[in-house]
Amino acid sequence: MALRQIRLSEDEILRKKSRPVEVVDDKIRQILDDMLDTLQNTENGAAIAAPQVGILKQLVVIATGEDIIKLVNPKIVKKEGEQEVVEGCLSIPNVYGKLKRPKKVTVEALNENGEKITLTGEGFLAKCFCHEIDHLDGILFTDLVTEYIK
């Protein structure tokens, strides 16, 4: 188990675009495992993107309940509907805000074995997909907030 330091909002790495992963190898799988360990060591985190642990690669880990999703080079290929959500972020502790996200999204990515996968998420999972893929483009949820929650 390797815990990585979560980068905070003032870290400029969070504003940079992540690079696609060329080959899904043991090194990439280790980073994904470290990201999962780091996520599971947080108080109430549901997902994490590689830039949040200082790595500019297109990697995302989502842990919702018993489901663990590891994504390499994820791209949103379809959005449906709209929902108002409340979000927070491991990189911006104790800040929460309302924003609009698609109600349903479809994502294409590679899994940790380098196989192409397509996943569709609704509600909370759709929000996670959008939030984490935004991180890969240097976008923080605070860029999209319509109202902060005290």
Swiss-Prot record:
Top-level enzyme category: hydrolase
Establish whether keyword Repressor is in the entry: no
Details of cofactor binding: Binds 1 Fe(2+) ion.
Q: Which GO terms describe its biological process?
A: co-translational protein modification; translation
Q: Which UniProt keywords apply?
A: Hydrolase, Iron, Metal-binding, Protein biosynthesis
Q: Which CDD domains match?
A: Pep_deformylase (cd00487)
Catalytic activity entry:
N-terminal N-formyl-L-methionyl-[peptide] + H2O = N-terminal L-methionyl-[peptide] + formate
> Any idea which positions bind Fe cation?
C89, H131, H135
Q: Looking at the record's lineage, which domain of life comes first?
A: Bacteria
Q: Is Metal-binding among the key words of this record?
A: yes
Q: What is its EC number?
A: 3.5.1.88
Q: Which GO terms describe its molecular function?
A: metal ion binding; peptide deformylase activity
The protein's required cofactors: Fe(2+)
Entry-linked SUPFAM superfamilies: Peptide deformylase
Positions of the catalytic residues: E132
What does the sequence similarity comment in the record state about its family? Belongs to the polypeptide deformylase family.
Record function comment: Removes the formyl group from the N-terminal Met of newly synthesized proteins. Requires at least a dipeptide for an efficient rate of reaction. N-terminal L-methionine is a prerequisite for activity but the enzyme has broad specificity at other positions.
| HAMAP family listed in its UniProt record | Pep_deformylase (MF_00163)
User: Per its record, how is this protein called by name?
Assistant: Peptide deformylase 2
Q: Which organism is it from?
A: Clostridium acetobutylicum (strain ATCC 824 / DSM 792 / JCM 1419 / IAM 19013 / LMG 5710 / NBRC 13948 / NRRL B-527 / VKM B-1787 / 2291 / W)
